[in-house]
Amino acid sequence: IARRSGNPVLVDPDAADSVERPEVQEEDSVSGEVDQMNEIALQIEGALESSIDSGEVIVERTPFWLEVVFNSSLLFESGSALLEASGELVLQSLGQELIGLPNAVTVEGFTDNIPISSTLFPSNWELSSSRASAVVRLFERRGVESARLSSVGFGETRPISINSSEQGRARNRRVVVVIMAELEDQVAGQSGSLRLIELLRQGQDSN
């Protein structure tokens, strides 16, 4: 029983219990996004199973994004941004999985620290950017919505291994396809969602 203006008012306890607290709704939403990303990861791992088994592709899971990491040697010849036929086939398999998804997709290109200087690629910035763009164009041709796609080249600036050995340099030469969770309910719009995920990823890289 509640009181309003001095008069008792009956409150239905069942109705009160049926109203979810905002924090509960947010937890349910986040849990749903995590489940969605796990489902997407399973689909992609199934589509790329042979390349994953051979070590040419790695799928890295987090709650709010997936990273599909391609060894550059699978996709490109040294110093080139033209996709190899074998690499195209693998990317087409991934693209087929992306067509039916609403998630934003960013393709990132990375190189080792060996300098390049050519008419097409004055530096590793241009090479990494061109490689990422080549993958985006393939996805677009396969039917992935252009509005969901973006690409960026980081050159040699974000190594994941040492550049003093050939093995380390080979790991650094990579293309990463990042599939973002949809977090529009937690932040202001898609651009805010993508910015939040990027900040989380940068924090992970710095650890």
Model regions and ranges:
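Extracytoplasmic
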Residues: 39, 43, 52-56, 61-65, ...
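Sec-exported extracytoplasmic/periplasmic mature domains
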Residues: 2, 6, 45, 49, ...
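Stable alpha-helical elements in mature extracytoplasmic
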Residues: 33-36, 40, 44, 87-90, ...
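Juxtamembrane linker/hinge segments adjacent to a transmembrane helix in small membrane proteins
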Residues: 1-71, 185-206
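Periplasmic OmpA-like peptidoglycan-binding domain that tethers envelope proteins to the cell wall
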Residues: 75-90, 110-195
